[in-house]
Structure formats: C-alpha cells, structure tokens
Amino acid sequence: MVDELGSNSEVGTLKVVILHRPGTELRRLTPRNTDQLLFDGLPWVSRAQEEHDQFAELLRSRGVEVLLLSELLTEALHSGAARMQGVAAAVDSRRLGIPLAQELSAYLRGLDPVRLSHVLTAGMTFNELPADARTDVSLVVRMHHDADFVIEPLPNLLFTRDSSIWIGPRFVIPSLAMRARVREASLTDIIYAHHPRFTGIRRAYESRTAPVEGGDVLLLAPGVVAVGVGERTTPAGAEALARSLFDDDLAHTVLAVPIAQRRAQMHLDTVCTMVDVDKVVMYANVVDELTAFTIERQPDGVTISDAAPFVEAAARAMGIEKLQVIGTGIDPVVAEREQWDDGNNTLALAPGVVVAYERNAQTNARLEAAGIEVLTIGGSELGTGRGGPRCMSCPVARDPLP
C-alpha cells in the first residue's frame, strides 16, 4: 500500500484523493459566527451535500478512489493513542478551566469512535454537555449561554487541501494560520499516524509555529514547488518548508510567490492552478504583477534570487521554454466575479483534464478554447466558504510525471 501513495505534480493522473462530505459542522454556522468561522454566508447544507456528492461521484467515474475524511478519522479512532490525541487537541483548558476540561476529557474518552469522530468535527455546545460534566465548581459552565461552543466546529474541514500536503512519497502536516482552522491539522495528523492505510508513510515536514497551508503549495513539476506567501502562509513558513524539502531530497527549487493579503486571494490556488504539464489558468488581474523569489538547493546550503516575474521564474525552474497562461482575460467585472467564485481553482484529474465550478462559464470557456477538458460541478452552496474543487480535495496518489 505504501508504494501506491504520493504525488510529484499537480496534473499527474489522479488515483486517490481525500474529501470531506459536509455535515453537522456546517449547520453550526449562524449570522453571529460566520466571520469567526471564515464563511461568507450560511450554506444550504442539504444542497451543499448534494453538490459534494456530485463532485465525489464525478471523481469515482474517472477512476479515482475517494477516501472520506470522517470515515478515515472514525477508523483511526479505534486506536487508544488516537483517541487521547484527538481529545487533547479538542479540549482547551485555558478557555474551559481545569474542572470542566477534566470532566469533558473523561467523557470524550468514553465515546465510541463514531460519536467521538462526530464531536471532533462538528463540535459541541454547552447545551450538549452530559449531565455529569456540568460540575457545580465550573464558573465557565455557569457563565456561558447554552448555545455557545464548548468545542468549536470545523466547517472548513470541507477544504481538505489545506491541512495536509503530499510531496513525493511523503506528507506534510502544516500549521494553519487562522484560529478557526488550527485543530484541522490535528485530525489529519491522527489519520496519518493511526490509520492502517498510511502505515509506514514518512512525514516530510511539520511546523507548529510558522504557518503553511496546502492551498498555497503548487507542485509545478517534479522537484519544483511554488509556495504562495500572503494571508495564510508566512515567509518563515515558506522558507522552513523549502529547507525541509531540500533536506529530504523532495525538491531542488522552491518559488516563494507573494500574493495580496486579502480574503479573495487567501491562497495561491485562488488565483493560479495548473491545468496541464505546461499550462496554468490565472486570474487576469495578477498575470503581470505576480512575482517569485527563487530558492535553490546548493551543495553548501541554499541561494535565494531576487524576485522575477512568476511565469518566467516558473518556466526556468521547470526546465521548459514557456509556461502558457490561460488568463481569464474577459470583462474586468466578470473576471473579478469569477475569481471570487473560484474560477481559477481547478482540480486536475490528468494532464489537460480539470474539474471546475459550472457557474464560472466564461473562465471555463477559455479553458476549453485552449484545449483543456473541463468537467463541471455545481457549487452554489459549496462556494460559500470560498473554495473550489482544488480546495476541496487532497490528492494522496497521482501517477508520477517523469
């Protein structure tokens, strides 16, 4: 099983992917907490589930094995060590106080794997605390409203791209930047450490300090990795990842790509994704301004070159004459709307074959005009968290590119 897993590109034929079907965690969203939980609206959950099921079925119809995060987590939680790890990550004694934290931890450790998996993903309100956890000595319990969260939900689990990254035959457990998402990495950590499917797989990098998120990491070609630096991934995170990849011989060149620190461009893959071995789709407004610092491995360390145009730096690192840009060079208003709706956030199933949201009609038409096969899915509800097909998928295995 170990030899089947791994990826060295964005476009090698996709074999295995991790998705998360949206569930109760989305039903926890209210007008009061959407900003805190990083959603731009209240999704119609049953419709979001239908759209996600369509996405998963499309992948299966193309021969992709779809692994669901909640099922992997439930299976991993049969391990006692996994249960301890999950409970420790979910129960914050600094926020809950020692008495409640102790009572809650004991209760959670007694849950069966299915129920514990549900709580770790969907969270728990004070109203859902069992009677024997409502200790009379807990001021925290007495002062909180019943609908407040004792364990916060993880609605952004939908975007499995960010909480783990496969580079070569190894995986990365990153540190997520936003408080609402920090605990997601603990769940992927549990899965990779305790699920038998991943026995023997080695980590490439792990950071609990400098943030790196999977949406900022593009595998441009074997040995060449681009890392967006902006709202989520920091320069320190990008540099630490680069040095780790060099040490493990997983890359020879890393491009650090500054992006605007704004919600619409939170990750590099919101403005640019690979659609073929030498083609990218890119938001028109950044084509001329996107740059990259080239970090290269050397026998005695690394060298960091001055910023150069991203497309030129990428082509040079990839060893190709030109990286073709399929721009959303349409009406500026339409281009901005479709970028906001994740028009540039495509998932490649094979060279020249991508999945995209159907609503981004003009971007999709430009891709098709450039010879790309575009497979569309609905995304009216899935998109309320600002993520597209690439964001919603963590490729675990692709056919390697030479």
From Swiss-Prot:
Location(s), subcellular: Cytoplasm
The upper taxonomy is: Bacteria, Bacillati, Actinomycetota, Actinomycetes, Mycobacteriales
Q: Name one GO molecular function term.
A: arginine deiminase activity
Q: Which organism is it from?
A: Mycobacterium marinum (strain ATCC BAA-535 / M)
Query: What InterPro entries does the entry give?
Result: Arg_deiminase (IPR003876)
One GO cellular component assignment for this chain's record is: cytoplasm
EC number(s) reported in the record? 3.5.3.6
Give the coiled coil ranges: none
User: What top-level branch of life does the organism fall under?
Assistant: Bacteria
Q: What is its main location?
A: cytoplasm
Residues forming the catalytic site:
391 (amidino-cysteine intermediate)
Does this UniProt record's set of keywords contain Cytoplasm?
A: yes
Keywords from UniProt, A to Z, are: Arginine metabolism, Cytoplasm, Hydrolase
**Catalyzes what?**
L-arginine + H2O = L-citrulline + NH4(+)
A single Pfam family it belongs to is ADI
What's the protein called, per UniProt?
Arginine deiminase
Q: Which HAMAP family match?
A: Arg_deiminase (MF_00242)
